[in-house]
């Protein structure tokens, strides 16, 4: 018989930087999860994604055990890295802060496709391009 789920926790944690301090500690502590066990497992699993915030979904069971799923870094993080910018603009219509080529957009699509709500690469490219435009990043050929 399957274990009874008592909760699900969604967090964004910097890769290899999970530690018992907020926000990780309090979120897991409320559910009775062994915080250090999670931190060690998360840091080990994300050691090849350094420099990104990683969305994670933690499922907590009645016996205080847990499983977690890591997702791909947010599209905005991937766009910022590809465009070489620190942050987007507050006014994307007037201020352009960087440029991405269509090839770079397709690279981002390859990474993010599993997390997007489409399986079509053309549609996924439109989603990523829209996110980039919202940040003030131009898409060029």
Curated annotation (Swiss-Prot):
It holds the Pfam family Ribosomal_L11_N. GO terms for molecular function: large ribosomal subunit rRNA binding; structural constituent of ribosome. One or more lysine residues are methylated. InterPro entries: Ribosomal_uL11, Ribosomal_uL11_bac-typ, Ribosomal_uL11_C, Ribosomal_uL11_C_sf, Ribosomal_uL11_CS, Ribosomal_uL11_N, Ribosomal_uL11_N_sf. GO terms for biological process: translation. Keywords: Methylation, Ribonucleoprotein, Ribosomal protein, RNA-binding, rRNA-binding. Signal peptide: none annotated. GO terms for cellular component: cytosolic large ribosomal subunit. Part of the ribosomal stalk of the 50S ribosomal subunit. Interacts with L10 and the large rRNA to form the base of the stalk. L10 forms an elongated spine to which L12 dimers bind in a sequential fashion forming a multimeric L10(L12)X complex. Forms part of the ribosomal stalk which helps the ribosome interact with GTP-bound translation factors. Belongs to the universal ribosomal protein uL11 family. This is Large ribosomal subunit protein uL11. The gene is rplK.
